[in-house]
Structure formats: C-alpha cells, structure tokens
C-alpha cells in the first residue's frame, strides 16, 4: 500500500514537471565544475547555481586550514557540545563571530551549529514557547517555516515586506513575547527585507527580531559582516542567524544574540543539545575563511561580485523585455529570472545545459505557483567572460524560441 501510494505521488509530480533529481559533482565547488548523473561520465559545466558567493569553498588557505585542523583535532568531535565534543576551535570561532557582531548586538555572544536549518529550528522552538507569538514574513525560508510549525507559540504571517500589515498585527497582539521572524536576503528573490523599519516596529511594540542572514553574511557590508553592518543597525532586540556554508565557503551556522539568550539556547535548544558537534577541523577552517572575508582580499572579491551583478542585470533586463520574462528586483548575488511555467523553466535550464551552462530551475512549492524561474547566483570567482557567456547563451535561447 505504501509503495503504491508513493508511486502515484511520483507520477503526479512528474506530470506537473515537479520531479527533483540529484546531480553528481566530480570536482570542487567552483564556477567550472565537472558534473554528471549517477554512473555517467561527467561533463564540464559553467555553474551559476551555487551559494559560494565569495568563491571560498575551494580557496587554498581555507583548504589548508581544514587539513591543519584535522591533523590537530582529528576527523570528528566524538560527542555533543555539552558532553565532550566542544573543542578549542569551536570556542575560538564563536569568539571571533561575537567580535564581528558586537557593534550591532550589545553584550553579544554566539553559538555555532552544524547547519543553518538546525540553527533556525533551535531559535524558534527555544524562544517560541507557549504564550509567545511569532510574526513570520510570508516568504521565509523553509527552515524558519518548519521551526515556527514546531514551536508552541501562536504563529501569524504578514505579506511580503508589508510593514503596515505587520504593525497592525503587532498593535493588536496581547502576547507576552512578540518575535518578528524574517530572512534578510530572500533566497528565491534576492531582495532585502526592510530591517530598519522592522526594528522601529520592534522597539515601538516591545518585540524582538529574529533575522536569518543566510545570504548576506560574508557578502554584505564594508567588511562582509552582513546585513546589520550594511544597514548600520544596532539593537539589543536583534537575534541574528548567520550561515557559514555559503559565502564563508565551509559549513555550519551560528546564532548571535545577547548573552542571556545564548545561555538559554545552550540549555534548552534541542537541535543544539541532542546532536554530535561539528568536526573541530571545520571550525578551524572557518577561522581562515573569516580572515579572508574581513581582509583586503575579501574587499576585492566583493568588488568583483558587484561588477558581475551589474553586468548580469543589465543584460538580463534587455533579454527579459524581449522574451516576456520578469527580472526580479534584486541587487544581490541572487538574480531570479521568472519564466512562469514549470515546463518552460525546465526547458530553458536544459537548453543552457546543452550549451555547457548549469542554472537551476526553481518550481513550486519552493516558489509560488506560476512563478517558476531560473535562480541565477553569482560568485566572486566568476569573471566577466563567464557572465558574458551566460548572457550569450540566453540570447541564443530567446532567438531560437522566436524562430520556432
């Protein structure tokens, strides 16, 4: 019975062009990567779908630090943080991250997690207790949505970036604990949440803000310290979540907040307590990554990324006008080219791959019905020639469609 039900579900997904499949990377994460199917010979593809925004996943200094960390601390941690798995490398990483966030969160401490999903689940379930209310942005990442579902708090959603609607909800709430929950950079659209206004509302209505800066940490801000640095925000009411497997190029995530909140998470957050700590070598490698992000090389890499974003947007705007597509309103490394139909998005992705370029087609339920898209992501490791090649391939696809 179970297998038959699952087969029918698979058939329905296939009919709606919603089937997902894994590809196999045979080489390191980089703009040019050897990619294949299970059991097939790989082909070299120019890739515009990773979240390695700073191009650090294959950086020699980060790799060397990972090797050094493994030699010093071993391959694994052996236990959870609260048993015997918390190492000097974890402590040093948390201290460095706290230094980064200290100008924006008074009395800041940080807590390192194995994944961003776990960090989001931990914060929402530990703070979203009975009697609390979570005011959730409608386009939040799935991990924030799942965390809200598991929390015992009341959950209220407000429309995308609609601060007036949020203020009405806050004003009407009698909750003893109000928590505004939002992405900073929205993962499928690339636009930035109105955090300055959200902070004003939090202060006015005695609320706190949980900000998931997964796609901003390491990229935004003069030193790459993230969206809070970029916007010049500072408040005790900020609970900040940063991802370390995207721009930082390695793995994991962290929560930065007032020391009292971090102490509460250490003692109550089940995704932190009941799992084996990440390998110390990963934390050691992240220290090298943070040094690059904050230093002169990081500044140069962010400048290169900015150049590529501007070049890509200029070309995509022209193509979208011809093809009837919609280019999302994004100034970040995430550039959504909205095609609309699921099949059309898959076909365009396949056309590009036949030309040696890999761009993922994003479909419901990840995005709303009728907004299937190519999610084009840029890296500081991309060159202007890489961007030009993508634009030329898209232009050829548009011309081919016009002829057909």
Swiss-Prot record:
Residues bound to substrate are 20, 141, 366
The record's EC number reads: 2.3.1.47
The annotated subunit structure for this chain is: Homodimer.
Q: Which NCBIfam families match?
A: bioF
Q: Reaction(s) catalyzed by this protein?
A: 6-carboxyhexanoyl-[ACP] + L-alanine + H(+) = (8S)-8-amino-7-oxononanoate + holo-[ACP] + CO2
Q: Per its UniProt record, what InterPro entries does this chain match?
A: Aminotransferase_I/II_large, AON_synthase_class-II, AONS_Archaea/Proteobacteria, AONS_Proteobacteria, PyrdxlP-dep_Trfase, PyrdxlP-dep_Trfase_major, PyrdxlP-dep_Trfase_small
Q: Which Gene3D superfamilies match?
A: Aspartate Aminotransferase, domain 1, Type I PLP-dependent aspartate aminotransferase-like (Major domain)
**Pathway participation:** Cofactor biosynthesis; biotin biosynthesis
Query: GO MF terms on file?
Result: 8-amino-7-oxononanoate synthase activity; pyridoxal phosphate binding
In its UniProt entry, what is this protein called?
8-amino-7-oxononanoate synthase
Q: What's a Pfam family this protein contains?
A: Aminotran_1_2
UniProt keyword list: Biotin biosynthesis, Pyridoxal phosphate, Transferase
Q: Which GO terms describe its biological process?
A: biotin biosynthetic process
The organism's lineage is: Bacteria, Pseudomonadati, Pseudomonadota, Betaproteobacteria, Burkholderiales
Q: What does this protein do?
A: Catalyzes the decarboxylative condensation of pimeloyl-[acyl-carrier protein] and L-alanine to produce 8-amino-7-oxononanoate (AON), [acyl-carrier protein], and carbon dioxide.
Positions bound to pyridoxal 5'-phosphate: 116-117, 187, 215, 243
């Amino acid at each position: 019975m179970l297998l038959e039900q699952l087969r029918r579900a698979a058939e329905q997904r296939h009919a709606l062009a919603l089937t997902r499949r894994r590809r196999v990377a045979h080489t390191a994460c980089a703009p040019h990567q050897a990619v294949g199917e299970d059991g097939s010979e790989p082909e070299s593809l120019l890739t515009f779908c990773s979240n390695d925004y700073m191009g650090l996943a294959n950086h020699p200094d980060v790799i060397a630090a990972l090797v050094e960390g493994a030699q010093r601390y071993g391959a694994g941690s052996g236990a959870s943080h609260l048993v015997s798995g918390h190492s000097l490398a974890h402590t040093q990483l948390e201290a460095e991250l706290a230094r980064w966030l200290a100008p924006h969160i008074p009395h800041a401490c940080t807590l390192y997690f194995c994944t961003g999903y776990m960090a989001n689940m931990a914060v929402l379930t530990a703070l979203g207790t009975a009697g609390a209310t979570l005011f959730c942005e409608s386009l939040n990442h799935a991990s924030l949505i799942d965390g809200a579902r598991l929390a015992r708090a009341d959950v209220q959603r407000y429309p995308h970036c609609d601060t007036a609607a949020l203020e009405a909800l806050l004003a009407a709430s009698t909750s003893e604990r109000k928590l505004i929950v939002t992405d900073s950079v929205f993962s499928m659209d690339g636009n930035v949440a109105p955090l300055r206004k959200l902070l004003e509302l939090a202060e006015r209505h005695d609320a706190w803000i949980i900000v998931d800066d997964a796609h901003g940490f390491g990229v935004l801000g003069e030193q790459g310290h993230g969206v809070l640095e970029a916007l010049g925000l500072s408040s005790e009411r900020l609970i900040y979540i940063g991802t370390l497997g995207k721009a930082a190029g390695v793995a994991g995530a962290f929560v930065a907040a007032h020391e009292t909140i971090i102490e509460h998470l250490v003692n109550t957050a089940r995704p932190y307590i009941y799992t084996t700590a990440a390998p110390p070598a990963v934390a050691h490698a992240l220290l090298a990554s943070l040094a690059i992000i904050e230093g002169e090389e990081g500044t140069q890499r962010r400048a290169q990324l900015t150049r590529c974003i501007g070049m890509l947007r200029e070309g995509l705007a022209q193509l979208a006008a011809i093809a009837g597509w919609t280019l999302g309103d994004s100034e970040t490394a995430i550039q959504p080219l909205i095609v609309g139909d699921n099949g059309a998005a898959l076909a365009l992705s396949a056309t590009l791959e036949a030309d040696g370029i890999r761009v993922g087609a994003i479909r419901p339920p990840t995005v709303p019905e009728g907004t299937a898209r190519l999610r084009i992501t840029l890296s500081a490791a991309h060159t202007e020639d890489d961007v030009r090649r993508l634009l030329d391939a898209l232009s050829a696809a548009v011309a081919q469609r016009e002829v057909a």
